[in-house]
């Protein structure tokens, strides 16, 4: 399903937050294009968020990032009205939450939205299980039911067996998992995560990012993730919002942010990113010419001659990759009346589309033929050649497929290892 076909989970329309007294005047000045500094000087009020406008799709990991003071935490707290918007509207599943009563809002917070903060805020005198079930306890849920749900959530985050421990017996990373489990116990549609991993050591932080991605694959929640770390945003986000001084300066996929920055600020923000840890084989693969295994060696020879290559991948009728045919072997087979199956070489390397370039650099460098890119059914999707890998790592857009898939016809010469 394409992004455009996914149902909209959250819709934010021209939402602003003004801190101060002259909010109406400040909102009008924003509408007239005045800057944050101009509004502060004229009204004494501070612009926290300026006319934010975006949609979040169901099941998406939507990252809001920016430096300190950019407005990202203010924005996420307006999504559940922990901070009241000064202007604009917010919809969840089509329901406008900005005009809900306290009772209606309380119901939304209980059933649809949970929040995970940077500080774990666990009760030291309660066990891990008791901390995890606390939200359901406040709702008056039966003890047996809430403990069962809490145990299921702890299992999801890898803490099965720790339910009778106390917070001070757990590491920082494990405590943050408890916070995540507590949020999941309510079975919300939406998780708001505000700098949830920022206080953790780098190695633990990466583990938690992996845990979050695995969890997302398993339960499919819509996640709004706040961070100031670009590497973290690029690693986990389906789409990223970049903020500065309360303004949204760009919204896009990680690839769009990296390869097509909207202005100089974004360009500087991403200039030091290690592309090898962001781009994948799918971003640089080219269309692969192949030969069906049921064709004869003369067909394979003709294809290779026309393409100017010395080897070609062989596939079956379903495009499943079977092996490599070398020109020298095909020539001998044609002279000896052998089939392609008789000369099929099955010693070759494949990589999935989502393999990061940092993981395939050595493989591509050592290979004497292009590396085959395959899907989960071992069907041929494309090839990676050395020249494209080097060009992409150098930041040359010519070698990068915008959406991480190969949609363009390749120059046959690209089949050769260069």
UniProtKB/Swiss-Prot annotation:
Q: Which Pfam family, an example, fits this chain?
A: CBS
A GO biological process of this protein is:
amino acid transport
| InterPro entries on file | AAA+_ATPase, ABC_osmolyte_uptake_ATP-bind, ABC_transporter-like_ATP-bd, ABC_transporter-like_CS, CBS_dom, CBS_dom_sf, Gly-betaine_transp_ATP-bd, P-loop_NTPase
Q: Does the keyword Translocase apply?
A: yes
Q: Can the keyword Translocase be found in this entry's annotation?
A: yes
Q: Which SUPFAM superfamilies is this protein grouped with?
A: CBS-domain pair, P-loop containing nucleoside triphosphate hydrolases
PANTHER family in the cross-refs: GLYCINE BETAINE/PROLINE BETAINE TRANSPORT SYSTEM ATP-BINDING PROTEIN PROV, GLYCINE BETAINE_PROLINE BETAINE TRANSPORT SYSTEM ATP-BINDING PROTEIN PROV
| Similarity comment | Belongs to the ABC transporter superfamily.
Q: What is this protein called?
A: Glycine betaine transport ATP-binding protein OpuAA
Q: Which organism does this sequence originate in?
A: Bacillus subtilis (strain 168)
